[in-house]
From Swiss-Prot:
Cellular component, GO annotation: cytoplasm
GO biological process: ribosome disassembly
Stated name of the protein: Elongation factor G
Homology family: Belongs to the TRAFAC class translation factor GTPase superfamily. Classic translation factor GTPase family. EF-G/EF-2 subfamily.
Gene it is expressed from: fusA
Keywords: Cytoplasm, Elongation factor, GTP-binding, Nucleotide-binding, Protein biosynthesis
The UniProt record lists the keyword Isomerase: no
Length: 689
């Protein structure tokens, strides 16, 4: 089956995404079980799930790296990317969304839409990914299908259209009404393989009728022929409904909603059927866009195995046995093992050692990967996350991925002197795998600092150092990753001259520096050759290096752009080094005039508390410089949404527990950087000295 050729129309590249603990890995496990890939179902709480293949994942029962797995269902090849639901791993979700064609969002029937669901949904909106929703855990206490559908509409503004209704809930959840076919499925056994297709139970006919009418109205909105039939009261066939639904999903106008219990094996095969019926194939999505490396001209590439190669390396992982694996999506063309490809971001040729298709943690060697496929490459040396691989005769750079800045850092040191070098190598490998993880040396103290997206993120990094790389280390207290920026548009000069004996040094430049919302930009506006072309990159490098340490308290400077507009040079004494120093001097001079301010990470916090503790909790959030955004009731509790500076959130879990007698819980995730009040800024500067 695996070696059979599948036409592109029969491919589905989908991601499974959700809030932590919504049952995502369990659902993926069941999909692998029903599609014949696994003979015994792995249970997450037994620590045996096949998709969770890193040791820490099996211990913690959460998914950290997104494994890409190939399986087969009803004559289709389905590539599944399982993504983590914990906020510290948003980057994994971001990278997988970049390479999928469709996504299944899993909700917990008890909670409906949760904060991480919102984050992931927004990320999917950015990439215009068609999606559907599976409301899981229908067998659990407090499961409420209609409430969950309501949260999709209210919190995500999604046009959520139920295609199914559950028969019973909690302990009595026994089957599913299929609104498309207008019949019912009753489960007869625990494995969910024995089921009866019967009529809709009497006591649910009225409700099924009401929801089927809503379904028909939704498909009529996207299909004029159905609209005419519907208005004239004609019968609309099941096939017509399915065709219109597919059209609506692909246009991001309809989000189909299904239900079930992955753990109890109910609803999973129907979910697989729906993935094939309504999710896009690589042919249904727009041709991938990119630019020509030398001219910057926009280009597109079709999903066609005969077109020139265009592929994106979306994840780098280190495998203990075969070394570096580059997970790759082939958008067009064909990649063959043993051949050379061109990495257009690095401008280097790379040799492909082996090509493998992944199944959670076992590999199948293949000779080639074609347009629309996902696989991993062994043997690449210089490729990192987000790089494009293509033909050197036909180069293209696909849109790169942007990753958020780390918000928290800790100092780390090996327990033994011998561990220092080992730790350096290990940290470099981990940083290569994960673009939101950074490691650097603090120039003043000489300490090694690791920075990431949250405490769990860094805990797992330290854990991997010990397990995979056998480096024992001591870890300091978490610190907030402050940044600096400017508020004024200024001009400044950088002049570096040294002419005492021997060869002199001469570099001189004028820059304009201005605040911006986006990433760092460098614009060369020098005319008339006042600075020779070959020295321009050195000025840019000098500015970028100097921006790693701002003038307020030595934190990295962000959100600014630079325009180089003038300067001068000396025929003999000028060098790249001299211009690099001049660039860094110009940067420091500009920053001292540009109203520099300190920025701190502001976190989006969502606290769920029983009503009687609300006053206390809100008072506490206000005392932490929090800004309350709103409150909504949810299942006997109140949900408080607020923005709070990260520096005020350390130890919050303990405070919340004592204020609510253990009944409150919270989640937080990085939202944006904002200016630090003067009094706090002075305190931070004082602590740095």
């Amino acid at each position: 089956m695996a070696n059979k050729e599948y036409p592109l129309a029969k491919f589905r590249n989908i991601g499974i995404m959700a809030h932590i603990d919504a049952g995502k890995t369990t659902a993926t496990e069941r999909i692998l079980f029903y599609t014949g890939k696994t003979h015994k179902i792995g249970e997450t709480h037994e620590g045996a799930a096949t998709m969770d293949w890193m040791e820490q994942e099996q211990e913690r029962g959460i998914t950290i790296t997104s494994a890409a797995t190939t399986c087969f269902w009803k004559d289709h090849q389905v590539n599944i990317i399982d993504t983590p639901g914990h906020v510290d791993f948003t980057v994994e979700v971001e990278r997988s969304l970049r390479v999928l064609d469709g996504a299944v969002t899993i909700l917990d029937a008890k909670s409906g839409v949760e904060p991480q669901t919102e984050t992931v949904w927004r990320q999917a909106d950015n990439y215009k990914v068609p999606r559907m929703v599976f409301i899981n855990k229908m067998d659990k206490l407090g499961a409420d299908f209609l409430m969950s559908v309501g949260t999709l509409r209210e919190r995500l503004h999604a046009n959520a259209v139920p295609l199914q209704l559950p028969i019973g809930a909690e302990d009595s959840f026994s089957g599913i009404i299929d609104l498309v076919k207008n019949d019912a499925i009753i489960y007869k056994d625990d494995l969910g393989t024995v089921m009866d297709e019967t009529e809709i139970p009497e006591d649910m006919k009225e409700m099924a009728e009401e929801y089927r009418t809503m379904l028909l109205e939704a498909v009529a909105e996207v299909d004029e022929d159905i609209m005419m039939k519907y208005l004239e009261g004609e019968e609309i066939s099941v096939e017509e409904i399915k065709t219109a639904l597919r059209k609506g999903v692909l246009a991001n106008k309809i989000v189909p909603v299904l239900c079930g219990s992955a753990y109890k094996n109910k609803g999973v095969q129907l979910l697989l059927d729906a993935i094939i019926e309504f999710m896009p194939s690589p042919l249904d999505i727009e041709d991938v866009k990119g630019t020509e490396p030398t001219t910057g001209e926009e280009m597109t590439r079709p999903a066609d195995a005969k077109a020139p190669l265009a592929a994106l390396a979306f994840k780098i992982a280190t495998d203990p046995f075969i070394g570096k694996l580059a997970f790759t999506r082939i958008y067009s063309g064909t990649m063959k093992s043993g051949t050379y490809v061109f990495n257009s971001n690095k401008g280097k040729r790379e040799r492909i050692g082996r090509l493998v298709k992944m199944h959670a943690n076992h590999r199948e060697d293949v000779e080639e990967l074609k347009a629309g496929e996902l696989g991993a490459i062994v043997g690449l040396k210089d490729t990192t996350t987000g790089d494009t691989l293509c033909d050197d005769a036909d180069p293209i750079i696909l849109e790169n991925m942007e990753f958020p800045e780390p918000v928290i850092d800790v100092s780390i040191e090996p327990k033994t002197k011998a561990g220092q070098e080992k730790m350096g190598i290990a940290l470099a490998k981990l940083a290569e795998e994960d673009p939101t993880f950074r490691t650097y040396t603090n120039q003043e103290t000489g300490q090694t600092i690791i920075a990431g997206m949250g405490e769990l993120h860094l805990e797992i990094i330290v854990d991997r150092l010990i397990r995979e790389f056998k480096v024992e280390c001591n870890v300091g207290q978490p610190q907030v990753a402050y940044k600096e920026t400017i508020k004024k548009h200024v001009k400044a000069e950088g002049k570096f001259i040294r002419q005492s004996g021997g060869r002199g040094q001469y570099g001189h430049c004028w820059i304009e520096m201005m605040p911006t919302e986006g990433e760092y930009e460098f614009q060369n506006a020098v005319v008339g050759g006042s600075i020779p072309k070959e020295y321009i990159p050195a000025i840019d490098n000098g500015i970028q290096e100097a921006s790693q340490s701002g003038i307020i308290a030595g934190y990295p400077v962000i959100n600014f752009k630079v325009k180089l507009f003038d300067g001068s040079y000396h025929d003999v004494d000028s060098s790249e080094m001299a211009f690099k120093i001049a660039g860094s001097m110009a940067f420091k001079n500009a920053m001292s005039k540009a109203d520099a301010v300190l920025l701190e990470p502001s976190m989006k916090v969502e606290v769920v508390v029983p009503e009687e503790y609300m006053g206390d909790v809100i008072g506490d959030i206000n005392s932490r410089r929090g800004r309350i955004e709103g409150m909504t009731p949810r299942a006997g509790a109140e949900v408080i949404r607020a923005f709070v500076p990260l520096s005020e959130m350390f130890g919050y879990a303990t405070t919340l527990r004592s204020k609510t007698q253990g009944r409150g819980n919270y989640v937080m995730q990085f939202d944006h950087y904002e200016e630090v009040p003067k009094s706090i800024q002075d305190k931070v500067i004082g602590e740095r000295k």
